[in-house]
Amino acid sequence: MTEYLDREDVLTAGSIAFGGELKVRDYGLLDAAVARPQATVYGVDAYPRLWDKAAALLQSLARNHALVDGNKRTAWAAAWTFLHINGVQLAADFDVDRAEDLMNEVATRDCDLDSIAAELAGFAAAAQTG
């Protein structure tokens, strides 16, 4: 069974990544981003794989700008918190520069979910990518 984050989980992860208290600009956008990984269509998961769910969360948080500042950092932290509580670890030696590039791409361009999911899987510890 997949475990999901709630609003407070996302804000906590984001505050840690941001290094201070986050200011929410729009709670509706924040709640929509938090709910997106759980979306279903006619009772079927809209995002069936764990990587798809994490990508949906990351994309929505990075692009919706629900926060005054720290949207990309919160998106990264929330996606990896979500993956962590579902048994996936971030590789200790992940490419920080590539992660930063990914977040900038997601925030400023139309990145499809499959590409984001594949990138996230590439950052996972080797034994976790299956």
Swiss-Prot record:
Induction note: Constitutively expressed in all growth phases, part of the MSMEG_1276-phd-doc-MSMEG_1279 operon. Negatively autoregulated by one or both of Phd-Doc.
Record note on disruption phenotype: The phd-doc operon is not essential. A triple TA mutant (missing vapB-vapC, mazE-mazF and phd-doc TA systems) survives antibiotic challenge, suggesting the TA systems are not required to generate drug-resistant cells. However the mutant is more sensitive to oxidative and heat stress, and does not survive long term starvation during aerobic growth on complex medium. There is a difference in the level of branched-chain amino acids, which may play a role in monitoring the nutritional supply and physiological state of the cell.
Keywords recorded for this protein, A-Z: Repressor, Toxin-antitoxin system, Transcription, Transcription regulation
Keyword field contains Transmembrane: no
Any one GO molecular function term: kinase activity
Keyword GTP-binding: no
A family per Pfam: Fic
Domain Fido: from-to ranges: 5-126
Function: Toxic component of a type II toxin-antitoxin (TA) system. Upon overexpression causes bacteriostasis. Its effect is neutralized by coexpression with cognate antitoxin PhD. May bind the 30S ribosomal subunit. In M.smegmatis 3 TA systems (VapB-VapC, MazE-MazF and Phd-Doc) may be involved in monitoring the nutritional supply and physiological state of the cell, linking catabolic with anabolic reactions.
NCBIfam families: DOC_P1
Name used for this protein in its record: Toxin Doc
Annotated source species: Mycolicibacterium smegmatis (strain ATCC 700084 / mc(2)155)
